[in-house]
């Protein structure tokens, strides 16, 4: 069967569109078990991850205080339920939170009630946005989906 994306070669290989475009077949293969081997978004028992979902401004302020006083290396992941790119990068962030268990990753849903002031405190204007803190200082920021840069920043700052 020929792909319906005949002009796909005109899109840059490293562009977001190329990375997020998925060919959909007219047939479904029930024998395809690749999804069975994928990691669940739920944390398994014994998971070493340090992934925290912030639900209130008080929780956000506490996390930001820990990040700014230097006591806790942190990543703030600003996201939204409606954000397609956020859904693409979420599994990578979960994987990295397991790889670097001493770094706390805080997930902040920008549409969560009471967190609108949090967005202003760190000057977040788009999602996904990741801000990296080490030694009490914001060391890096990534806006958008850049998996290679995300892995590189994590390795440089927290290894």
Swiss-Prot record:
Keywords: Disulfide bond, Electron transport, Mitochondrion, Phosphoprotein, Redox-active center, Transit peptide, Transport
PTM annotation (Phosphoserine): residues: 40
Chief place of localization: mitochondrion
Keyword Electron transport: yes
Matching Pfam families: Thioredoxin (PF00085)
Active site, renumbered: 83 (nucleophile), 86 (nucleophile)
Cystines in this chain: 83-86
GO-annotated molecular function: oxidoreductase activity, acting on a sulfur group of donors, disulfide as acceptor
Superkingdom of the source species: Eukaryota
Record's keyword annotation contains Cell inner membrane: no
Residue span(s) of domain Thioredoxin: 43-159
Subcellular location: Mitochondrion
One CC-aspect GO term: mitochondrion
Residues marked Contributes to redox potential value (site): 84-85
Function: Thiol-disulfide oxidoreductase that may participate in various redox reactions. Possesses insulin disulfide bonds reducing activity. Reduced by thioredoxin reductases NTRA and NTRB.
Family under the similarity heading: Belongs to the thioredoxin family. Plant O-type subfamily.
Protein name, as recorded: Thioredoxin O2, mitochondrial
Natural source organism: Arabidopsis thaliana
